[in-house]
Amino acid sequence: MVSIRPDEISAILKQQISDYDKSVSVSNVGTVLQIGDGIARVYGLEQVMAGELVEFEDGTEGIALNLEDDNVGAVLMGEGVGIQEGSTVKATGKIASVPVSDEMLGRVVTPLGQPMDGKGDIPSTESRLIESIAPGIIKRKSVHEPLQTGITSIDSMIPIGRGQRELIIGDRQTGKTAIAIDTIINQKGEDVVCVYVAVGQKAASVANVVEVLREKGALDYTVIVAASASDAAALQYLAPYTGAAIAESFMYKGKATLVIYDDLTKQAQAYRQMSLLLRRPPGREAYPGDVFYCHSRLLERAAKLSDAMGGGSMTALPIIETQAGDVSAYIPTNVISITDGQIFLSSDLFNSGLRPAINVGISVSRVGGAAQTKAIKKIAGTLKLELAQFDELAAFSQFASDLDEATQKQLGRGKRLRELLKQPQFAPLNLAEQVAIVYAGVKGLIDEVPEDQVTQFSRELRDYLKTNKPEYITKVQTEKVLNEDAETILKAAINEVKSSMLASA
C-alpha cells in the first residue's frame, strides 16, 4: 500500500491555489430568434451599441443596426449558413474598422480590409474606423489645386480641383467607369493615392479594371475595394465607407488622394434591401428616410485640408446610374444636391460616336474653376459657349434650307470642336497636349481642315510637338501657363502640321 505523505498533499494544494485564476470574463451574449435574408433577430445583447460588430457561433460577423424593445436586428456580413435559431451571438464591443497602411497600395481588399487577390496578408500596424466624422470648417481650405483627369473636355470645361466632389452620372454603358479609370491612369507621377471602390459589380468587371490598371502601371498607387454583386448587402453598403477610410488615412498624412465610388446607386439599393428587411418604414421609391444622410456623410468626408492639418486632400468622384436619362429620380437628385458639380453622360451622344459622351450643356463644376490651370483657362473660356451655340444652331439648321455664310462657318467650327474633343479610352492627355488641341479649335486655325481629318490632325499635332517641339511641352507642363513664346511655337506647329496635311490631301 502506497503511503500518503501530508507534505506532498499540502504542496499540491498550495500549487493549485497559487495557479487559481480568479478573473471573471464578462461577455454580452444573446440568442438568435430568427434568421433569414441576411438579417438576424437576436434576443439579449442588452448592452450592445448601434453599429457594433457582433460575432455569431459559426464565426460570421454582423452589425447591430436595429435596437428594439425586445430584440436586436443585425445584418450579416457573410453567408451565415451555420447560424440556426437558438445559436449564441456575442457582442464584440468594437465598431467596424479597417486596417490601413502603405502596404495596401496595389492590393484588392474586401470592405473589411481583408485581401482577396491571393497575394497574402497585408501587414498593418494601425486601423481606422470605417465611419468617421468629416473634417470641420476650420480644418478645411477652399479648393485651389487642379486634379487633371487627362480628358480634354473635362479639364477644359468642367475642371475638377483637389478636395472636390464631382458626380459622374449617366445611363448604363455610357462610359462612366471609363472616365474614372482614365482619371486614375492620369495620376501617374502626380503623387496621388487612388482608391477605387467597386459596389455590386460583376466580379469579371472588377478583374478587368485591375488588369487595365496593372497594364498602365497605375496599380502601384491604387487600392481597390471590391464588394461584388454576389456579396452580402451589408458588405455592399459598407464598401464606400471603407474606401473613404483608406483614403482618409493618406489624406491626414498630407497626401493628395482620389476616391471613386462605382457606383452609389448599388449602395443605395443594398441599403434599401437591408432597411426593408429590418422593417424600417419605407419612403420615396421604397428607400428609407435616411438614405440622403447615408450619402451626405460619405461625400462630406472629401475635403482639402488646411495647412495646419497637413494640407492633404481627398477628391471624390461618385458615380450614379440613371434609368433612361432620368436625373430627377430620388437618388440622382440627392447626390446632385450633395456634390460640387456633375458630369452628365448621354447615351444619345455615346451612340452617335462622341466619346467620352459628355453633355457639356448640363454638366457643371461649381468649385473647380478656382483650381483650373491658367494655361487652359485662358483659351477654353469660350469653348463651352461655342459648343452650346453649335448645338442650338445644329437643331435649327435641320429645318432651314439655305444658311448664310456666317452660320455655316459657325456650324463647321462647332463640328470640328466636337471632333477635337473625341478621345480614345485609357489614353489620357497631358496639359500641354490639351492646350494645343483646344487652342487650334477655338482660334479657328483648323477651319480649313476637312471634318473627317480633324482626329488625324489632332494626333499628328501631338506627335509633332513631342518630337520636334519638346520645348513647348516642357514650358507648358512646368509653368502651367501659355506665355507668348509658347504660343508662338504652338501657332507655328499648328500651321506646319495643317499645311503638310492639306498638301498631301
UniProtKB/Swiss-Prot annotation:
ATP binds at G170, D171, R172, Q173, T174, G175, K176, T177. Pfam families: ATP-synt_ab, ATP-synt_ab_C, ATP-synt_ab_N. It is an enzyme of class 7 (translocase). Its EC number is 7.1.2.2. It is found in: Cellular thylakoid membrane. It is a peripheral membrane protein. It catalyses: ATP + H2O + 4 H(+)(in) = ADP + phosphate + 5 H(+)(out). It comes from the Bacteria. One of its GO terms (cellular component) is proton-transporting ATP synthase complex. PROSITE patterns: ATPASE_ALPHA_BETA. Keywords: ATP synthesis, ATP-binding, CF(1), Hydrogen ion transport, Ion transport, Membrane, Nucleotide-binding, Thylakoid, Translocase, Transport. Produces ATP from ADP in the presence of a proton gradient across the membrane. The alpha chain is a regulatory subunit. F-type ATPases have 2 components, CF(1) - the catalytic core - and CF(0) - the membrane proton channel. CF(1) has five subunits: alpha(3), beta(3), gamma(1), delta(1), epsilon(1). CF(0) has four main subunits: a(1), b(1), b'(1) and c(9-12). Belongs to the ATPase alpha/beta chains family. This is ATP synthase subunit alpha. The gene is atpA.
